Amino acid sequence: MYGKIEKIHFVGIGGIGMSGIAEVLLNLGYKVSGSDLRKTEITERLEGLGGEIFIGHARENVANVDVVVISSAVHDDNPEVVEAMERLIPVIPRAEMLAELMRMKYGIAIAGTHGKTTTTSMVATILAKGGIDPTIVIGGRLNSIGTNARLGQGQFLVAEADESDGSFLKLSPTIAVVTNIDADHLDFYKDIDEIKDTFVQFINKVPFYGLAVLCLDNGNIADIIPLVKKRFNTYGLSTQADFRATDVRHTGFTTSFVAHYKGTLLGEITFSMPGAHNVLNALATIAVAMELNIPFAEIQAGFKAFGGVGRRFQVKGEVRDIMVVDDYGHHPTEIRATLAAAKGGWDRRLVVAFQPHRYSRTKELFEEFVKAFYDADILILTDIYPAGEKPIEGITAESLAARIKRHGQKDVTYIADRNAVCDHLLGIVKPGDIVITLGAGNIWQVGETLVEKLKGDL
């Protein structure tokens, strides 16, 4: 960045996307400050790295900064944003700052409605194993390094590209991956056609020497391929895909498959993450790694070393033969994939506690949510996590639970108070069960409490 920018302030610095950029900037030597509503493990980490953290938003927090960075969750009436605008301090979206970091490197941007965090984490791991030493900014904690960001010395920056508000169009990646396109964020987009058009724009921002990596198994991506003007490779289980998986096997946490490229056998890939959707994420990663000339043997070794991502089928504990898992899945497609992974990897009763995320998403995808839980043997719903949204009349977790029950789901319970979910689980779980907490809000706390209480009963 131009030398006159020295102090950068993040409004909502504790968010997983904001904190990653802040950490990279701290490691680059910039003075970084930020505010959030509460102290967390993330804010404490940034403070330990030299960041100045304010708890609560106040006008005086931005008195001596050069630029203010905001996420899509921060509104114009935020006192720090108001103060910055009055002082004529630039206020920029998170994606613009990420684009600035990407401008200094060759960017690898992973986009898609689902699978971004896992795929970004896989790519970061394999590139590091291949000696490329990338800078990484991920929307989840990479278990192998204990954080979601890292400043590397190599030429590449690997980052998640957030499509939720169209701001990923500010990025200009050298390699763009699109894992899938699905109906989501319909509070911002008019319809699926507008979402597809935005992804076409994103893909075509790749330079003439770059590459797009596209999942052919996704129908919406297949629809837009004729509109892609840049060099691309496809991947999937389809026989028409450039990178293809065969002989897929799932046993517990272990997934393995045989990889092929344009009819040529590459070899077997094995990694510790369940689910057919993660086979696709792995194929995307192979496509990126081979574009960067990483030998396939090193790709194989990287996958064997891959330790997964926080809140993506993350085991919180196993007590009395009851496995407690947490997963970020909050869209019907993600929920189906996660539950299918659990059923495919284990022959165990599946107890699911789901916290819907955002009123707008629950409204727009209500009927899809109704049919997303058929793999759950027992389903518990708790109140919607608002994520800053105001309630929408008639859109509640209770009404969703009732509708799910009417559609044939046999064991569905609505519990308004999230804190009461744990006590309910304690009364119904038994040895052999898998308990999954699902949602992008704070439902993960239920799983952690459950593990502690199960330990206390020993």
Curated annotation (Swiss-Prot):
Single GO MF annotation: ATP binding
Record's catalysed reaction(s): UDP-N-acetyl-alpha-D-muramate + L-alanine + ATP = UDP-N-acetyl-alpha-D-muramoyl-L-alanine + ADP + phosphate + H(+)
Biological processes per GO annotation: cell division; cell wall organization; peptidoglycan biosynthetic process; regulation of cell shape
UniProt keyword terms in alphabetical order: ATP-binding, Cell cycle, Cell division, Cell shape, Cell wall biogenesis/degradation, Cytoplasm, Ligase, Nucleotide-binding, Peptidoglycan synthesis
Signal peptide stretch: none
Chain positions recorded as ATP binding sites: G112, T113, H114, G115, K116, T117, T118
Predominant place of localization: cytoplasm
Broad EC category: ligase
Any single Gene Ontology cellular-component annotation: cytoplasm
Keyword set includes Ligase: yes
Pathway: Cell wall biogenesis; peptidoglycan biosynthesis
Location in or out of the cell: Cytoplasm
Free-text function comment from the UniProt entry: Cell wall formation.
Classification via HAMAP family: MurC (MF_00046)
Family in the record: Belongs to the MurCDEF family.
UniProt name for this protein: UDP-N-acetylmuramate--L-alanine ligase
